[in-house]
């Protein structure tokens, strides 16, 4: 999914603000046939600190216990995190489960998967409504100068004159490139403190450096734009 390439100002496309990487050409089947450790979906209180929501179970797929997941990023792009992870964490209300994934693949604009211990359609249907999380460490590695959205949230944004412009609060995909939502403190019409937002295209002509270690993004952007 999208990264920052100041050389040619390109950006990949994504469909949500949790993570993003460049478009990837890939076979429609990922990890098919790779066996996971045996076990059924199990209740868990041990929730990983780096869990990132990447989709939701919306239906069963077929008759043999596969589930269909609507991803927060295009399958075959950001959806690669779902395909790459061998364990998913599921949440529906107060219910939390951990499940190993035996097989997964893309299907149209969704990801379909076979959780261990889910053997028929009825069991798969019972999983509808679960939000799906994977660990950040299970995301596929990116090429140089590319970034997942989740890693940009909270970074400070300054311009080339070191003027603070705010912090990244989210990302938007407009179908052509990504856009940073940058929140900053402001004063409301009633004189009370509030927050305002500026939108900065995440393209090379504006984004000059992204320093994740320093948690800072430098942009060619003025405070009064």
UniProtKB/Swiss-Prot annotation:
Q: Which GO terms describe its cellular component?
A: cytoplasm; ribosome
Q: Which UniProt keywords apply?
A: Chaperone, Cytoplasm, Ribosome biogenesis, rRNA processing
Subcellular localization(s) per the UniProt record: Cytoplasm
Instruction: Domain (PRC barrel): give its ranges.
Output: 144-225
Q: Name one GO biological process term.
A: ribosomal small subunit biogenesis
Q: Which residue stretches, if any, does this entry annotate as coiled coil?
A: none
**One MF annotation (Gene Ontology) recorded for this entry:** ribosome binding
Q: Which family does it belong to?
A: Belongs to the RimM family.
Domain-level remarks = The PRC barrel domain binds ribosomal protein uS19.
Subunit and partners:
Binds ribosomal protein uS19.
What this chain does, per the entry, is described as: An accessory protein needed during the final step in the assembly of 30S ribosomal subunit, possibly for assembly of the head region. Essential for efficient processing of 16S rRNA. May be needed both before and after RbfA during the maturation of 16S rRNA. It has affinity for free ribosomal 30S subunits but not for 70S ribosomes.
Which PANTHER family does the UniProt entry name for this protein? RIBOSOME MATURATION FACTOR RIMM
| Protein name as it appears in the record | Ribosome maturation factor RimM
Q: Which organism is it from?
A: Burkholderia orbicola (strain MC0-3)
User: Which gene name belongs to this protein?
Assistant: rimM
């Amino acid at each position: 999914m999208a990264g920052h390439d100041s050389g040619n100002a390109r950006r990949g496309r994504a469909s949500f603000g949790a993570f993003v990487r460049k478009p990837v050409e890939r076979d429609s089947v990922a990890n098919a046939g790779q066996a996971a450790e045996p076990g059924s979906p199990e209740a868990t209180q041990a929730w990983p600190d780096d869990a990132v929501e990447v989709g939701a179970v919306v239906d069963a797929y077929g008759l043999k216990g596969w589930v269909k997941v609507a991803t927060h990023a295009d399958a075959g792009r950001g959806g690669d995190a779902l395909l790459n992870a061998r364990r998913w964490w599921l949440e529906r209300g107060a219910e939390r489960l951990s499940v190993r994934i035996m097989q997964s693949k893309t299907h149209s604009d969704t990801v379909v998967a076979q959780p261990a211990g889910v053997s028929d359609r009825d069991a798969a249907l019972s999983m509808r409504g679960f939000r799906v999380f994977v660990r950040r460490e299970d995301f596929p590695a990116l090429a140089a100068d590319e970034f997942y959205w989740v890693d940009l949230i909270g970074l400070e944004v300054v311009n080339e004159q070191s003027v603070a412009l705010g912090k990244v609060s989210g990302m938007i995909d407009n179908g052509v490139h990504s856009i940073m939502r940058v929140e900053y403190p402001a004063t409301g019409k009633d004189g009370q403190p509030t927050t305002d937002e500026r939108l900065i295209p995440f393209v090379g002509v504006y984004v000059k450096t992204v320093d994740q270690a320093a948690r800072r993004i430098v942009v060619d952007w003025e405070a009064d734009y």
